[in-house]
């Protein structure tokens, strides 16, 4: 009986973890264009930020801040490919200033926003 209870607990615990991960990802998807950080996510989830930080990292391999920045860079790339100017899009993508946008974009793409736009506009 104790083995059955342990297995049931593990199944429920796993599904609870998956539910939390999906909720975190959904919340980030809906809010990454504003000044979003782990404190906001934890507050929204009514969970301890250390817990969600460990859970998210163990389930996705990424920290929440990396996930948010990757999503922001993905949006920035799409806007640049659509012909928008880098100076005009950083705020739309959730960055508070151009310097941070530039640094994060370059970190994830190995090129500046302008280089990315130039490279991909010739395709």
Predicted features and spans:
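Short, Lys/Arg-enriched, Trp-marked, Pro/Gly-tolerant hinge/linker segments that flank
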Residues: 1-26, 30, 39-45, 58-66, ...
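Terminal helix-turn-helix DNA-binding modules in bacterial transcription factors
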Residues: 26, 30, 35, 58-96, ...
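Residues within helix-turn-helix
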Residues: 39, 50, 85-88, 99, ...
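Short hydrophobic/aromatic patch on the recognition helix
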Residues: 51-52, 56, 100-101, 105
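…primarily DNA-binding HTH/wHTH and HhH modules…
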Residues: 103-123
